[in-house]
Amino acid sequence: MALTKADLAETLFEKVGLSKRDAKETVEVFFEEIKQALESGEQVKLSGFGNFDLREKSERPGRNPKTGEDIPISARRVVTFKPGQKLKARVENLPVEK
């Protein structure tokens, strides 16, 4: 199961007491701020959670899996996430499901 923006809004509604409309808008604004910061080339640091960064990937050779033809993969910018120490510690202590 995945955590969705709707789930986050529902949690704000239940635990913080925001109206459902305000809770949904708060979640949307939060993610929009992160998107805008990244689009501006800024790092996003969420204390106790982790950091979002942009990384440049240079052009590299690739191959079309259907035809086997060599094709270049163009240079691009990608978003990376590095979890913070507190998040790492909480996740590392979870039991492994088999």
Swiss-Prot record:
Pfam families according to UniProt: Bac_DNA_binding
Entry's Gene Ontology molecular function annotations: DNA binding; structural constituent of chromatin
UniProt superkingdom: Bacteria
UniProt cross-references to SUPFAM superfamilies, sorted A to Z: IHF-like DNA-binding proteins
Keyword Magnesium attached: no
Family: Belongs to the bacterial histone-like protein family.
Entries under PANTHER family matching the protein: DNA-BINDING PROTEIN HU, INTEGRATION HOST FACTOR SUBUNIT ALPHA
Function per UniProt: This protein is one of the two subunits of integration host factor, a specific DNA-binding protein that functions in genetic recombination as well as in transcriptional and translational control.
Stated name of the protein: Integration host factor subunit alpha
Gene that encodes the chain: ihfA
